[in-house]
C-alpha cells in the first residue's frame, strides 16, 4: 500500500517538474519572507547591543566547533569522491544540486526558527552536513539514468520512489526521534544541537520527496540530444540498477526500526506532556537566549550602516576557526577538481565505462535543409575493408573465436581475421594493461561478484566466463550490450553463443560486426544484435527537380536498377528538369472500438462528425506533442465495431509513434463521454499500415506528391532509344489496362517499389512501408507542337517517410540523407525536410519509370539484364563480400 502511494507521488512529481520546483522554491521563500516581515525587529550588533552574545561566544568551545566543521567538510568530500568513482557527471551534478538546495532549505528553516538571526548558521551547518546522505539521492538518480526515453525516466523515478520512499521515510522518522531525545536532556547546548539535527533530517527528507525527483526529471529532459532523438545521459553501467535496488530492505531491520520508533514516541510523550506538562522555556527561546536575543539583556543603539551592509560585513569578517575551515574546503575542492582527474580516468578505465554520447557538429542556422560537413568521428568510424593477399591462399573454414580488440590508437577500422581453431579464447577486454584473466573460467559466484563490483565489472571477466554466466541464467542474453564495457563486446559474445547452437559454426564468419556504433542501435533500431548487413549503395543523378540537382543514393542488390534510374535522371535533366508539389501531408492511425449495440456505435459516429465532437478529440490529441495536429477524422462502422481514422501532421518524423500516442489519448477522452466504449486495439487496420489498402490509395497517407516533366523528342530518340508514340502505347496497355486486369490497388506503374525501397534502405526508412509508399500511377501522353515530345507524370498518394527517428539516427543513413540535404529536423519550417525527401522519392520514381518504359518499348529489357544483372563469378570460389572475415 505504501509503495503504491510513493509510486503515485513519484510519478506525479516526475511528470510535473516545473510545477513542483516552482512550488517548492516559492514555499521556501515564503517561509523566509513571512519571518522577515513579521519577526523580531531587534538585530544584535546592528540596532541592539547584546552583551551576553559576546560572552557566549568567548565561552564556547571553539576548538570542538572547528573540528566539527572540518569533519563535516571531509565527510561531504568523501561522499562526492565515492560518487565520482561511478563515472557520471550527471550523478555528480544532481547530487550537488541536492546538497545545495537542501542546505538552502535548512538555512531558511534555521533563520525562521531563530527569528532571522544568521549567527545560528555557524553552528547549524556542520550538523546539516554530517547528517546529509547522498546514497539515497544517487540511488534515485541511477534509476532515472538507466532510462532510454523521457517517459521511461518518469516511470523509473516512480519505481525508485516506490522502493526507496518507505525506507527513507522510516529512517527519517527514526533519526528524528533518536536525535530528538537530546532536546529533553536539560543541557542547553545539547538541546540546541539536537534541534539543529532534527531540522537537518526534515529538510533533507522534504527535498528528497519533492524538489529532487522533479529536478532529476527536468535535468534529464533538458539534456536530451534532440537531433538524434536519443538521450545522451543513458548509462549502460546503471542498467542493472533496477534489479539491484529491487531487493527490498531486510524486513527484520524494518520491524526493529518501527518498534524503536514506537518506543521513542512513548518516551517523547511522557517527557513532554506527562513528566513536565508546563515547560518553562522552549528550545527556540533557549536558542534565542544563547544567541543573545532576549530582551532583558539587550539595549537599543543607533545603526551606523544599512542592514544589508551589516550582514555583508558579518559574512566577510572571518575568525581564525573560519579561516581554517575555509582553507580546508578550498584545498579539498582544488584537489577534487584538478588533481583527481587522472586518477579518476584511470579508475574508470577499469570499470564499465559509460557510453559516450554521439558527437555531432552543429547545423547551419540559415537553412533548414542543411548539410553537415563532417559526420564520422574518430570513435564512430564506419566499417571498411582491406584486401589481404593471404585470404585467397588459405580457404579453410574457420570457426568463430573470441576476438582481440584492436588498440585504441589504431586509426584504421578493418575486419580482423578470426583466431585459428587452436588459438586460446581471448576476451575483448583483456588488452588493458594490468588486467590478467585466468585461462580457466572461475566459479559463477566469484564471476558474479566481479561483475557487480563497482571497481571491476565485466572487463575483468573473460568471454568464457560471461558465456558461463549467460548459460547459468545469471545474465539475460538480450542484456549483453548493456552489461559489457562496450556494446561491441556484447555483440561478439552473443555471436559466440549463437555459433555454438548452429549446425554450421562458421555460418557467421562473413557477417561483419566490428567497428560499428551500436549505441545508436540499442533501444531504437534492433535487438539481439549479431552484426550488420552491408548492402551496396549506388547513386543516380543528377536529378534536376524544382530547379535543384540531387544525387540520389540507392541501396539495392538488383543489377540494372541504379543504371536505369540514372538514365532516366539524365533524360529529365536534358528536358529541363522536373517539377513537383506536395498535395497533402498527414499520417493516419485507425483504431477499432466497440460499443454494446450498433446503434450506440452510430451515435458515437454522428457525435465525432460534429464540430463539437471533433474539437474535443482534437484537443486531447494535440496535447500529446508539439508537432502532432489532428487534421480530420474518417469514421465508419461494421456492426457494433467503430473504426476511426485519425489523420495528423507529424513534422519531420514519419510519425507512427507520435500519432499512436495521440490516438491513445484521444480514445481515453472519448471514453469519458461514452463510458461503455471499449478500446479493442489502437490499430484496427483502418490506417492502413504496411498492407495494400484502397483507403491509402484514395484518401492518402503520409505525403501525397505529384511530379511531372516534359522530355523532348530528341532526348526520347537519342537517350531513351525509342519514340514517344511507342512509350505512350506501352504505358496505356501495361500500366493502366494491365494493372486493371490484375485488380491492382495503387499499382498503376512499372516498378515504383524498386526505387522507393532502394531509397528507403539507404536513408534509414522503414522498408516494410514500401507496400503503401509505392502506390503510384504513371501517366504518359504526347505533347509539344508536333506531338513528338513526351509528357510524363507520377502521382504518389501515400509516401510514408521521415528524416528523424528510427533508422535515420544511424550514421551511414544520415550520410545518405545529407547527400540530399534533408538530414534531421527542419527548425525553420518543421516538416519541410520530410516533404522535400518525399518529392525526391517521387521524382526518382518518375526517372525509373521513364527508363524502364523506354526499355520495354524498345525491347531492350531482357538484353540489358543479361548484361548487367547476371554474375559471371564462380560462386564456388567466392570468399565473401567482405575481403576479411568478421570473426
Swiss-Prot record:
CDD domains: HMG-CoA_reductase_classI. It comes from the Eukaryota. It is a multi-pass membrane protein. Its EC number is 1.1.1.34. GO terms for cellular component: endoplasmic reticulum; endoplasmic reticulum membrane; peroxisomal membrane. The chain crosses the membrane at residues 10-39, 57-78, 90-114, 124-149, 160-187, 192-220, 249-275, 315-339. Regulated by a negative feedback mechanism through sterols and non-sterol metabolites derived from mevalonate. Phosphorylation at Ser-871 down-regulates the catalytic activity. Its main location: endoplasmic reticulum. One of its GO terms (molecular function) is NADPH binding. The modification Phosphoserine is found at residue 871. Glycans are attached at residue 281. Residues 40-56, 115-123, 188-191, 276-314 are lumenal. Keywords: Cholesterol biosynthesis, Cholesterol metabolism, Endoplasmic reticulum, Glycoprotein, Isopeptide bond, Lipid biosynthesis, Lipid metabolism, Membrane, NADP, Oxidoreductase, Peroxisome, Phosphoprotein, Steroid biosynthesis, Steroid metabolism, Sterol biosynthesis, Sterol metabolism, Transmembrane, Transmembrane helix, Ubl conjugation. Residues 61-218 form the SSD domain. It is an enzyme of class 1 (oxidoreductase). A motif (INSIG-binding motif) lies at residues 75-78. Undergoes sterol-mediated ubiquitination and ER-associated degradation (ERAD). Accumulation of sterols in the endoplasmic reticulum (ER) membrane, triggers binding of the reductase to the ER membrane protein INSIG1 or INSIG2. The INSIG1 binding leads to the recruitment of the ubiquitin ligase, AMFR/gp78, RNF139 or RNF145, initiating ubiquitination of the reductase. The ubiquitinated reductase is then extracted from the ER membrane and delivered to cytosolic 26S proteosomes by a mechanism probably mediated by the ATPase Valosin-containing protein VCP/p97. N-glycosylated. Deglycosylated by NGLY1 on release from the endoplasmic reticulum (ER) in a sterol-mediated manner. Catalyzes the conversion of (3S)-hydroxy-3-methylglutaryl-CoA (HMG-CoA) to mevalonic acid, the rate-limiting step in the synthesis of cholesterol and other isoprenoids, thus plays a critical role in cellular cholesterol homeostasis. Belongs to the HMG-CoA reductase family. Homotetramer. Homodimer. Interacts (via its SSD) with INSIG1; the interaction, accelerated by sterols, leads to the recruitment of HMGCR to AMFR/gp78 for its ubiquitination by the sterol-mediated ERAD pathway. Interacts with UBIAD1. This is 3-hydroxy-3-methylglutaryl-coenzyme A reductase.
